[in-house]
Design a protein with these regions (language model features):
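Short acidic active-site motifs
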Residues: 39-44, 61
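Short secondary-structure boundary segments
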Residues: 56-57
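Short acidic/histidine-rich motifs immediately flanking catalytic phosphotransfer sites
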Residues: 47-51
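Ser/Thr/Gly-rich flexible loops in soluble cytosolic domains mediating phosphotransfer, phosphorylation
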Residues: 3, 73-99
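CheY-like receiver
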Residues: 44-45, 92
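Short, structured coil segments at secondary-structure junctions
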Residues: 68-71
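Conserved active-site segments centered on acidic
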Residues: 2-40
């Protein structure tokens, strides 16, 4: 599964990204994920990504991103993002990517 994880600049989402990679590895899943800012996501989504997950702090851009990006886009729930609940965020990614 190939996922874009977006926040304002890609910094805070990199923490969740590492947790998601660890979770995927421990469950034998193939996860290709990068953490980027929303501006970069608009530029790179066509590189084979299957879905985009938005950090809560940029959720105000959800509708705009859904119009610009032609793959599924969803907001990561605030609590899951804050505590780094990789399992719940992976479930969201699976749902978006029909996995």
């Amino acid at each position: 599964m190939k996922v874009l994880l977006c926040c304002a600049g890609g910094l805070s989402s990199s923490i969740l990204m590492r947790k998601m990679k660890t979770w995927a590895d421990s469950h034998g899943e193939d996860l290709d994920i990068i953490a980027v800012g929303t501006a970069e996501a608009v530029e790179v989504w066509q590189d084979g990504y299957e879905c985009v997950l938005l950090a809560p702090q940029v959720s105000y851009r959800l509708k705009e991103m859904q119009e610009e990006i032609k793959i599924p886009v969803a907001e990561v729930p605030s609590l899951d993002y804050a505590i780094g609940n990789a399992e719940n965020v992976m479930k969201l990614a699976h749902k978006l990517c029909d996995k």
